[in-house]
């Protein structure tokens, strides 16, 4: 007899607000591989329950009722496809080289990446069509190495959007990126603002979308396949931006719980402003953690618990979902989106300039976004993973040339 609940953690989260959405934060191509990996950890009745849950998460034959309503991906996440299905993609890349003998490694990487996006998009087309274009989008990111190159981002966006009607273009939260988002919105192209961590970024994005929509409506552009989401990379703000270190620099000790509260405060405020000002963009929560550790040793996932009830997209990577399944089945949710941050915590956080810049609408100007510590660190990580994809295809290119 198992104590595992029939409804999964994520299904119970959506019960609090059915308008919220769960997205898969990886390529759909590897979903079945991941399912098998998770099921290996379980046995008996527990395994059967989780198997049913995962069938409800992604079920192309019952797309309207499946849990996953969309997908986020990028070159970094697409590297997982090469790693998990290595031999298949080696053969695929070899085929690309045969068809394009003059292609270089950068061109080869881009063509392989587009193929991964295209195949993932096809897997969500049934949902896209049956939902009348409300759901079923797959976010495809422009190359993270060109986040300050407006022309290059626009060029890549135009290529990516041609792959499938349900492709949503992921654009970084730089000054140039927001200019691109405005242009894409004016053309009726769905966008996802990524590499974004702080309220000033979210507001610049929301206003860029608003201005782009005004142009689109003036020009009678078809907006039936348009959506806008604004990503908040929650734990990356605190961890990769080193909020604790920024506090120590001025003599303030911040606990892991304080850091989580900081991240929650930012997204709660963004959610409230978008709602009050009736912006059409929807906040997307990502980079969530099983955290903080509690005194009674119970598992906490504040990034979900403390914002439950909000009208969010929660995009969840395989590793995070696996942790929820294996370690967090007792988690329960209540509507906490309108509950305030503990005043003592907020007072302490507001003494730290790194947090104040993130929490105030005018805490940073657009020219400063590209230098934000979390932007710099995350862009570097994504770029390194992109180089991983390039190295993968480069190895195949060199092997072909040596034969």
Regions found by a protein language model. Give the residues of each.
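N- or domain-start disorder-to-order transition segments that initiate the globular core
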Residues: 1-53
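Catalytic alpha/beta core domains of metabolic enzymes, predominantly
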Residues: 190-336
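An N-terminal structural lobe/cap that precedes and organizes the functional/catalytic core
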Residues: 37-45, 54-87
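Hydrophobic faces of well-ordered beta-strands that scaffold small-molecule active sites
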Residues: 20-26, 45-52, 69-73, 136-142, ...
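C-terminal extensions of enzymes
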Residues: 329-403
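Generic structural signal for well-ordered alpha-helices
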Residues: 10, 113-125, 154-158, 181, ...
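Active-site beta->alpha loop and helix N-cap motifs at the rims of alpha/beta catalytic domains
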Residues: 65-68, 75-176, 180
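Active-site-adjacent beta->alpha loops and helix N-cap segments on the catalytic face
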Residues: 147-153, 171-185, 198-209, 325-326
């Amino acid at each position: 007899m198992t104590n595992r609940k029939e409804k999964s953690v994520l299904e119970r989260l959506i019960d609090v607000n059915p308008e919220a959405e769960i997205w898969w934060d990886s390529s759909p191509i590897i979903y079945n591989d991941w399912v098998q990996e998770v099921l290996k950890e379980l046995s008996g009745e527990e395994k059967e329950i989780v198997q049913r849950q995962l069938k409800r998460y992604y079920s192309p034959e019952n797309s309207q009722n499946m849990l996953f309503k969309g997908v986020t991906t990028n070159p970094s996440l697409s590297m997982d496809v090469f790693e998990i299905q290595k031999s298949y993609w080696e053969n695929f890349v070899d085929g690309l080289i045969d068809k394009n003998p003059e292609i270089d490694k950068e061109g080869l990487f881009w063509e392989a990446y587009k193929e991964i996006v295209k195949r993932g998009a096809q897997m969500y087309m049934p949902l896209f069509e049956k939902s009348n274009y409300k759901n079923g989008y797959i976010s495809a990111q422009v190359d993270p190495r060109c986040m300050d190159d407006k022309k290059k981002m626009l060029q890549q966006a135009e290529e990516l959007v041609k792959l499938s009607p349900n492709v949503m273009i992921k654009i970084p939260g730089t000054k140039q990126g927001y200019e691109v988002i405005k242009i894409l919105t004016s053309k009726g192209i769905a966008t996802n603002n990524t590499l974004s961590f702080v309220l000033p970024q979210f507001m610049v994005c929301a206003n860029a979308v608003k201005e782009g929509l005004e142009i689109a409506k003036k020009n009678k552009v078809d907006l039936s396949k348009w959506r806008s989401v604004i990503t908040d990379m929650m734990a990356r703000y605190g961890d990769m931006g080193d909020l604790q270190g920024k506090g120590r620099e001025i003599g303030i000790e911040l606990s892991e719980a304080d850091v989580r509260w900081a991240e929650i405060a930012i997204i709660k405020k963004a959610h409230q402003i978008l709602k009050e000002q009736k912006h059409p963009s929807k906040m997307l929560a990502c980079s969530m953690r099983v955290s903080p550790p509690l005194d009674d040793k119970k598992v906490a996932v504040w990034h979900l618990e403390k914002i439950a009830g909000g009208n969010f997209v929660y995009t969840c990577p395989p590793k995070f979902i696996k942790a929820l399944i294996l370690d967090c089945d007792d988690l329960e949710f209540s509507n906490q989106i309108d509950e305030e941050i503990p005043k003592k915590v907020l007072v302490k956080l507001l003494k730290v300039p790194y947090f104040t810049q993130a929490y105030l609408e005018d805490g940073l100007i657009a020219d400063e976004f590209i230098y934000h510590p979390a932007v710099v660190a995350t862009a570097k990580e994504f770029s390194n993973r992109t180089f991983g994809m390039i190295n993968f295809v480069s190895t195949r290119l060199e092997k072909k040339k040596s034969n």
